[in-house]
Every structure is written in C-alpha cells, then in structure tokens.
Curated annotation (Swiss-Prot):
Protein name in UniProt: Interferon-induced GTP-binding protein Mx1
Dynamin-type G domain mapped to chain residues: 31-304
Lineage per the UniProt record: Eukaryota, Metazoa, Chordata, Craniata, Vertebrata
Organism expressing this protein natively: Oncorhynchus mykiss
Function (record text): Does not inhibit strain RB-1 of the fish pathogen, infectious hematopoietic necrosis virus (IHNV).
Segments of this protein annotated with the region G5 motif: 243-246
Alphabetized GO MF terms: GTP binding; GTPase activity; microtubule binding
Keywords: Cytoplasm, GTP-binding, Nucleotide-binding
UniProt record similarity statement: Belongs to the TRAFAC class dynamin-like GTPase superfamily. Dynamin/Fzo/YdjA family.
Gene behind the chain: mx1
Amino acid sequence: MNNTLNQHYEEKVRPCIDLIDSLRSLGVEKDLALPAIAVIGDQSSGKSSVLEALSGVALPRGSGIVTRCPLELKMKRKKEGEEWHGKISYQDHEEEIEDPSDVEKKIREAQDEMAGVGVGISDDLISLEIGSPDVPDLTLIDLPGIARVAVKGQPENIGEQIKRLIRKFIMKQETISLVVVPCNVDIATTEALKMAQEVDPEGERTLGILTKPDLVDKGTEETVVDIVHNEVIHLTKGYMIVKCRGQKEIMERVSLTEATEREKAFFKEHAHLSTLYDEGHATIPKLAEKLTLELVHHIEKSLPRLEEQIEAKLSETHAELERYGTGPPEDSAERLYFLIDKVTAFTQDAINLSTGEEMKSGVRLNVFSTLRKEFGKWKLHLERSGEIFNQRIEGEVDDYEKTYRGRELPGFINYKTFEVMVKDQIKQLEGPAVKKLKEISDAVRKVFLLLAQSSFTGFPNLLKSAKTKIEAIKQVNESTAESMLRTQFKMELIVYTQDSTYSHSLCERKREEDEDQPLTEIRSTIFSTDNHATLQEMMLHLKSYYWISSQRLADQIPMVIRYLVLQEFASQLQREMLQTLQEKDNIEQLLKEDIDIGSKRAALQSKLKRLMKARSYLVEF
C-alpha cells in the first residue's frame, strides 16, 4: 500500500477493521450479520494463491477441497521493522504461531479437528490473525472452493454442502462477495459468479477477481480487458486482475516478494493487459488497496444499521431473560427465600386474578371476561326459557285445570295447578345451571394452570405440585358448588316471595297484557261465561312468579359459581401452596430446574453480555 494511502487512512482504516474483528471475536455474528468480505471461487480458480499473495503466508493447497472450513483471515499491518506475528483460534483452542512456515500445517490440523480427517467440510470458523509490515489492513473470510463432482471419500452431495455454506455467508446484505475467476475459462459459466448473482443481481456488493492471466489463449486477451472494463458481466464494484505464483514458481521457491515484482513486470510489459495496470486494475498491491478501501467504506456504511440491530437484539434478549427469571441461588438460605418469593408471587397473582385486579407478574390473564360472557349466556337462557314457558302455558293450564280442578266454581284460581307448573318449569333449569357451573369451573382451572406455567417456568416439580393442587381443588370446589346449586334449586321449589314483590310483578305483567290487547277484548274475555278468564288469570300469575324466580336465579347461580369456583378456589390454592413451604425436605426437589431452561438462560446471559460489550465498542468507536 502506498504512503499516501497509509497517511490518509492511518487513523481510520485499522480502527474500523479492528472494531468489526472485535465484534466477531465476541461471537456477535451468532446474533447479527457483520460487514465482511467473503472469498468464493470454483475449485482451482486460484483463490488460495490470491489469499497467499495478500497475507504473505502459505495456505493449504492441493487437488480437491483444500479449504474445508470458513477461514477468517485477519491481516494487521505493522510498522517497518516489527516482527511477524501469527495466531490461530477455533472453538475453545487458541495458539500463537511463531513461524510463518507453520501456518499451513496449523490450518490443516484445525480443519482435521473440526471437519474430520479427510475431505469433509464444517460450518465452524477458523480464525487466523497475521501481523506483519508486509500485509494490508484487511479481514477476509475464505470459503471452500465449489466442487462440481464428488471424489473418492467425499459424500455424494458435497457440492450442495459447499454451496449451502457459501450461501449462508454471501446472502447477508452485510457481506461483499469477492469472486475469483480464472482468465482461461468462460466467466459466464463459473458457478461462483452465478451464486453471487443469485443473491446480488445488481452486483452492488460483488467484486470480481480475474486470475491466471498468463494462461489466456492468444487472441482472447481483449475479452479479458473487456471483462475488467465491466463490459461483459456488469458488477457495480467492478473487477481486478492479478497474477500469483504458479505451481512451477512455488516448486522453484520463488518468494512472495519476488512474485509481486514479477507480477508487476508481467502487466507493465503485456501488449494487451498493460492498460489495466495503468488504470489501477491490476496487481496484488492494487487489489489490497481496493479491498481495504471497500471494506472500510462498507463498515462505515453498515455501522448505523448495526447499532440499531444491537439495540433491538438487546431489547429482545432482556425480554426473553425476564421470561426465564433469574434462576435459584446457590446458598441454601437464599434458596428458601427464592422459593418463598416465587410461591408468594404466584398465590398473590391467583388472588388478584380472582378479584379482577392487575397481576404483579404482568401476565395478561383475565378470567372475568369469560365469566361475564358465560353469566350473560345464563341470563339469556333464563329469558328464552321464560318465552318458551309463556308460549306453552295456555294449553298446559287448560290440561292442568281439567286434571287438578276440584269443587271450585269457575273463575277461582287453582293454586295447586299454579304450584305444579311453576315447579316443573324451575326443575328444567337445574340441568343447564349445573352444566354452566362445570363449563366455568373448567375455564377457571385452565386460567390457573396458565398462571402456574407462567410463574414456574423452568421448575417442573414446582409446576407439577401447583398443577396437582389446582386439579384437586377444582374437583372439590366444583362438587361443593354443584351441591349448593342443587340445594338452591330445591329451595326454589318452595314457591315463595314477599307479598309486595309478587304484587308488583303481577301489576307489571297485567300492565304489559293491557298494552298488548284492546281493553274491550280484555273485558269480554274476563266476563265470558266459560273458564277462559280463569286461564288468563292463571297465566298472568305464572308469568309473574317465573319472572321473580328467574331474576333470583340470574344472580344467585353466578354468585355461587363465582364464590366457590373462583374466589374460594384462589384462597384454597394460596393456603395449600404456602403450606408447601413448611415441608423443608421438599425444597430442593421443588427448586430442581429444567436442564433446558438452565442452559437456555445461560445462553441468553452470555448473549446479553456480548451484545452489551458490542454496544460499548460501538459507543467508544
């Protein structure tokens, strides 16, 4: 890199790249995408040679798949005279590298450990850090070369495995794809470029690198120039062309420094490609310069979005952690207090739920909306039953009159007929009332179970204990409530109300009847010689009393249900759960945490820690 570039970017380039490297080393990439340059290419495209030329170290070479894991290559430019430094890290392993010649061996060892000895691949990242005066400030991610055909020892779908791994990286909007293509193949047929175009049709984050210009067939040189000039397959970021060490030069032990000089001479002296050198589109040093500028620009462009993503992830992680709670402490005394707090919070929420007050835990459960709806249905049932009763009593009154009328003269009300018909109607309401009780009892049980699940997430034994108590209390209280309802209906079979109440109801019913038919018609009916007047009078009495009885039942049945199935349920649950705290021998068993919940909480705490660290890095930047 030239001095002007170094001076201009000395305070800007390294901090930018270091920031992203630091975020990646924190593991933030598990949570969100980071700006990166991913290097992709078909097998034998010259990808490894380009990376070697940029990094100054030998990387695994050979036939078939040599890059078997994503390799993060972090290059840090040192001042002249400072010593070369290397470090490789993967999974929980970290190792310093003293000699550049050991790099290839260390990468192979890492790949064997992560992807197995042989030709398999792995998604796990190997990080290689190189510090030297001869490297640019740059971080690249090298991905396996695209294999078209599986060779011996490889799975049949190796090609698809590699493509899936490559897509995982290049599909992210934060990734620049560095596509390596040999000059001696038809660029339109290269798999790597096709894949880049699939995820980046406009080529806005794709940079093409042409390799092996010395192997171009005579007469096709101008096609190569046209490609680099962006006239064949357009990429917004354009193309570069480089000439790296070939196999012959490697065998002859040509150093990378000498190879760079030979590359420069090759382009300067080439009849067709010299224009590309003059325009700054050729050689490894120019490529390094462009890549550094592209990466820094890309990082700066991505930072605002990155900050937003980190804030969103932090908020999301905090919310998730709140759901899982803090987990039980280690100290035995503190564990007891933890259990007391947990059980007390649950029982208080149960009481609040039964009284319609807001719950301390913030859980959104509302049993009263269900009760109001169901009690409304019960009242509607009473009204509809009354309407049906009114429609059929005329015929029934006549039948009862014939059956039960004794020595009375016409026009006298038969109280026995009245009583039998009232009791018959009330008996028909008992079954629906008990059914309504069971429906509401089941709905309340479900709400309490939801509250228990929310309160005791991650503590299966504590949850099981609460569920067992809820089921038992439900059975007992439902049975008690049913008994009380049936007693209520037995009492309703005693035909009684205050005289004033009955008189008022009778007057109301008569007034309604008067409004429904003309006065003359009423008079003619009342004073008719047959017993129709008696029937009309009887119907008025029946309607009047049913109205009183149904008003009592409309309130009394819901009150019994609400008291026993909800209010007493919550109180009994509170007593029994608090009683659990007296059983000291069960404390450890009750606080036994679900393994999955514990590990999930630990993962979330780790995620929160790295996101907060990442935020602090961005704030300090």
